[in-house]
Design a protein with these regions (language model features):
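Bacterial signal peptide processing site
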Residues: 41-43
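Extracellular mucin-like PTS domains
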Residues: 46-67
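A short helix->beta-strand "capping" segment at the edge of beta-propeller domains
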Residues: 67-87, 248, 321-324
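Surface loop/turn motifs at the tips and blade-to-blade linkers of beta-strand repeat domains
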Residues: 80-87, 121-124, 132-134, 185-191, ...
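Beta-strand-rich domains and repeat architectures in extracellular enzymes and scaffolds
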Residues: 81-107, 333-339
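Beta-propeller domain segments
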Residues: 106, 132, 137-139, 147, ...
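Asp-box/WD-like beta-propeller blade repeats and closely related beta-sheet repeat scaffolds
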Residues: 167-201
């Protein structure tokens, strides 16, 4: 072993691995090495203290997770800038991404996407009776989920091809195509041609409201155990909310309607309904008395068939039922779709309820006492009206969708 050059010779410590004894000596040698670094190799250095070097951490490279592209997502769209050909677009609805969805009575849901119209989905429906005569059946309602940004649900109401039932159906939008179709609600549909209702809308409470006509069974409108002649309220999945006014198993929200064919929700949550009045019903006027309810009441009982128009009795009295806010009296207008217009919308309609009529075009409602009044709007507003994300009005008739800024 090496000897220090300036010190007295020290006895060498010999470390040899010789079996168990050798291992013991090795341990002893290591112990000596800790106490005096001169053993088993290098000579000790005066006043030196061994400082252990901490282990150096080795960085493990990490890879950030790669987001999976959503193949169903659609980039933000611009609404249509002009007139769109559309065969009998019964109802219009904008999605939060700017796309315009519209339902054609013959059974196609269409969407304006990337500057062109495409078919989103179709339903098996009919628009005439079995003998080819007039009918109010068809694809009649359309609504966009209030949580569309996350669930992409689109809802529709239609009469089935067998003329025996009506349905609320739901799809999931995937890049402009309806997938995962699911029928949520089914209602019996009588043999009568007309008074089918068929409009749907989401309230500010997130619930789905459905309008049903009384199918020429006037007494059904006052029977809260019968869905006809009613405004019905459901959860988005088609179940009944427990806080409905007539109990947790009853979908009825309001009753006493002949054929409610327009429903609109205001910014403050109030719900308006347009209702087609008597037109040739036995014992009632032959024309007129279409009505508007500006703010639907929870559990509200309205006048049909006890009264029509501004509380004109049909036989007896009105039985304390609620009168409408506006009536066409002895003039038939045939009200259809309705919309509340935002305060930043077109000046002539801002802050008002507007509704289409098949007979006279758009009517603009001004609340008043004792009754509301109406003024005329675009004559093309025959089927439906909606306010676009650009604050323009979009209206439809039997052949086109129009834009009014």
């Amino acid at each position: 072993m090496a000897r220090p050059q300036s010190r007295a010779q020290r006895p060498a410590t010999v470390c040899q691995p010789l079996g168990v004894a050798g291992h013991i000596r090795l341990i002893a040698c290591l112990a000596v090495a800790v106490a005096a670094t001169g053993a088993c190799g290098s000579p000790p250095v005066a006043s030196a203290t061994a400082t252990p070097t901490p282990p150096t951490a080795t960085a493990t490279p990490t890879t950030a997770p790669t987001a999976t592209p959503d193949r169903c997502a659609v980039a933000q769209q611009s609404p249509p800038s002009g007139t769109i050909p559309a065969a009998f677009a019964t109802v219009l609805a904008f999605a939060p991404d700017g796309r315009l969805f519209y339902a054609q009575r013959s059974g196609a849901v269409r969407v304006w996407q990337n500057g062109a119209a495409r078919t989103f989905a179709t339903v098996p429906t009919v628009t005439t009776e079995s003998n080819g005569s007039y009918s109010e059946r068809g694809l009649l309602g359309l609504a966009i989920s209030p949580t569309f940004a996350s669930d992409r649900f689109v809802y529709a109401f239609y009469s089935d091809a067998n003329r025996t039932q009506q349905h609320v159906i739901r799809w999931r939008d995937c890049a402009g195509t309806g997938v995962a179709a699911k029928v949520l609600l089914t209602f019996p549909s009588g043999s009568d041609c007309c008074h089918k209702g068929g409009r749907i809308a989401f309230g500010h409470d997130g619930m789905l409201y459905v309008t049903l006509g009384e199918e020429h069974q006037a007494s059904a409108a006052q029977n809260t155990s019968d869905p006809r002649g009613k405004i019905l309220r459901y959860r988005p999945d088609g179940t009944i909310p427990p806080d409905n006014p007539f109990g947790p198993s009853d979908p009825v929200w309001a009753y006493g309607f002949r054929n409610p064919f327009g429903i609109a929700v205001a910014a403050d949550g109030q719900i308006a309904v347009t209702n087609n009045g008597p037109s040739g019903d036995a014992g009632s006027p032959s024309t007129g008395y279409d009505t508007v309810i500006l703010s639907l009441s929870r559990g509200g009982g309205y006048q049909w068939p006890y009264c029509y128009g501004y509380s004109h009795p049909l036989g007896g009295g009105c039985n304390g039922r609620r009168p409408p806010d506006w009536s066409s009296e002895n003039s038939t207008v045939i009200p259809t779709g309705a919309a509340f217009i935002d305060a930043s919308g077109p000046a002539a309609y801002a802050g008002h309820l507007v509704f289409c009529t098949y007979g006279r075009g758009m009517l603009v409602v001004t609340p008043g006492s004792p009754h509301a009044t109406v003024s005329a709007g675009p004559s093309q507003c025959r089927l439906d009206v909606v306010e676009g994300p650009d604050r323009a009005l979009y209206v439809s008739d039997a052949g086109h969708i129009y834009r009014f800024a």
